[in-house]
């Protein structure tokens, strides 16, 4: 072999070895860089060439085991005997290799609202001018009205709340559990006697074995019901009076297992068949404010709160309670008998009347004349007239179509 050719071949091997070292360093930098995936995609787009040596023409095995693109081999220029020069395509000198860019570290905390100090100063001036203008408007308003305008919004809110009074304040819920065999009414009244505030019944759940409901006037008296009844609703209230007692009453709606629904004002007792749970609420009334708002008409009932009681006046359930409070409503249900027209009844569920959707078995009720319910505007005893309808029902007549009573709608 010619000495020049051997020297040239030796230089090629050295350059190739140096180039492989540079490529390995670049690969290690790419692996440690956060932008490795992006650079890897960029290398996949580069053209790949199969390098061959000019002297032997044999393929050089790749040293990266196929993980990266094959390394480009040097291309030789014709040897003129003076110098040898190898050109490596896609080769980058070591001085041109730069370190990867480090990601910018984000500062912890809330970002600044204003980027420059000038913007912050302008915003501060704008806020100060707005506050000064609002203060000027308040002073002008005080000069016009001849008074002082409070700059504290919290004090104005407190004054508004203070003007409402103490009515309905100190509302506290209570749960009363009643064992089987005990009287629900007696338990509620005992709780009302122990409490120093007004009391109302919110809801109740459980079963009743024996109930006593008030009959409508003029017959009066109580009508007993025995059996297994489910409590649909229980409502009522007890209000303190000037004499130190409490007036009020309770009303109940019961449902039997056969589908009958009865209800009305409780007469004397309501015996629990199983565990009964009653939810009560105590609250406070502002009687001084109510007395001042009544205008001082001299009526004794104006000194207290005028609330409608579900029980008529008289001794409540034999417990020695003072008479009930004044009732201002009327029952829109009236009969055909003219002798009953002078009676004024209480409005809503819980009045002295009881209602019955279906007649209970074992109890036969007789009526001298069919009762009629009218909801039209011609009724003189119905303060809420103008309903625009006229319904009439007959009680005590059996019908195969609608069960225990027959309903007729006139033309």
UniProtKB/Swiss-Prot annotation:
Q: What's in the keyword line of the UniProt record?
A: DNA-binding, Nucleus, Transcription, Transcription regulation
Q: Where is the composition biased (Gly residues)?
A: 374-390
Q: Where is the signal peptide?
A: none
| Annotated stretches, region: Disordered | 1-32, 54-164, 289-348, 366-411
Q: Give the Low complexity compositional bias ranges.
A: 20-29, 120-135, 144-159
The record, for InterPro entries, names: AHL (IPR039605), PPC_dom (IPR005175)
Q: Please list the GO terms describing molecular function.
A: minor groove of adenine-thymine-rich DNA binding
According to its UniProt record, what is one Pfam family this protein matches?
Answer: PCC
CDD domains per the UniProt record, alphabetical: DUF296
Biased composition, class Polar residues, residue ranges: 54-66, 306-315
Asked if DNA-binding is a keyword of the record, the answer is yes
Q: Where is this motif: Bipartite nuclear localization signal?
A: 105-113
Of the GO CC terms on this record, one is: nucleus
Q: What is this protein called?
A: AT-hook motif nuclear-localized protein 14
Q: What does this protein do?
A: Transcription factor that specifically binds AT-rich DNA sequences related to the nuclear matrix attachment regions (MARs).
Using the record's annotation, list all stretches that form the PPC domain.
165-305
Subcellular location, record wording: Nucleus
According to the UniProt entry, the note on domains is: The PPC domain mediates interactions between AHL proteins.
- Bias class Basic residues marks the residues at 7-19
The reply on keyword Nucleus is yes
């Amino acid at each position: 072999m010619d000495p020049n050719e051997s020297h040239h071949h030796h230089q090629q091997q050295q350059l190739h070895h140096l180039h492989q070292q540079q490529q390995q360093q670049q690969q290690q930098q790419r692996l440690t860089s956060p932008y490795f995936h992006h650079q890897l995609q960029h290398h996949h787009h580069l053209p790949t060439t199969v390098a061959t040596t000019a002297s032997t023409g044999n393929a050089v095995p790749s040293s990266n085991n196929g993980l990266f693109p094959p390394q480009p081999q040097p291309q030789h220029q014709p040897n003129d005997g003076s110098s040898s020069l190898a050109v490596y395509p896609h080769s980058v000198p070591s001085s041109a290799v730069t370190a990867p860019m480090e990601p910018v570290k984000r500062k912890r905390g809330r970002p600044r609202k204003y980027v420059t100090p000038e913007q912050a100063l302008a915003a501060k001036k704008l806020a100060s001018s707005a506050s000064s203008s609002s203060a000027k408007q308040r002073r002008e308003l005080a000069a016009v009205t001849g008074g002082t305008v409070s700059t504290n919004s919290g004090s104005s809110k407190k004054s508004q709340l203070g003007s409402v009074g103490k009515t309905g304040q100190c509302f506290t819920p209570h749960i009363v559990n009643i064992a089987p065999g005990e009287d629900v009414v007696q338990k509620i009244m005992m709780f009302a006697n122990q409490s120093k505030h007004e009391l109302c019944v919110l809801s109740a759940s459980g079963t009743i074995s024996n109930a006593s409901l008030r009959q409508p006037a003029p017959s009066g008296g109580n009508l007993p019901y025995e059996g297994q009844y489910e409590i649909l609703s229980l409502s009522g209230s007890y209000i303190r009076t000037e004499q130190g007692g409490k007036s009020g009453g309770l009303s109940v709606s019961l449902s039997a297992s056969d589908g009958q629904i009865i209800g009305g004002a409780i007469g004397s007792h309501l015996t629990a068949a199983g565990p009964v749970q009653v939810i009560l609420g105590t609250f406070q009334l502002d009687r001084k404010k109510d007395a001042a708002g009544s205008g001082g008409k001299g009526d004794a009932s104006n000194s207290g709160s005028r609330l409608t009681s579900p029980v008529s006046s008289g001794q409540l359930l034999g417990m020695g309670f003072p008479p009930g409070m004044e009732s201002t409503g009327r029952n829109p249900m009236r009969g055909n008998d003219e002798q009953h027209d002078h009676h004024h009844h209480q409005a809503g569920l819980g009045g002295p009347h009881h209602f019955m959707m279906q007649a209970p078995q074992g109890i036969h009720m007789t009526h001298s004349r069919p009762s009629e319910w009218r909801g039209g505007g011609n009724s003189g005893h119905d303060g809420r007239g103008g309903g625009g309808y006229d319904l009439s029902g007959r009680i005590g007549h059996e019908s195969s179509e609608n069960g225990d009573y027959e309903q007729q709608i006139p033309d």
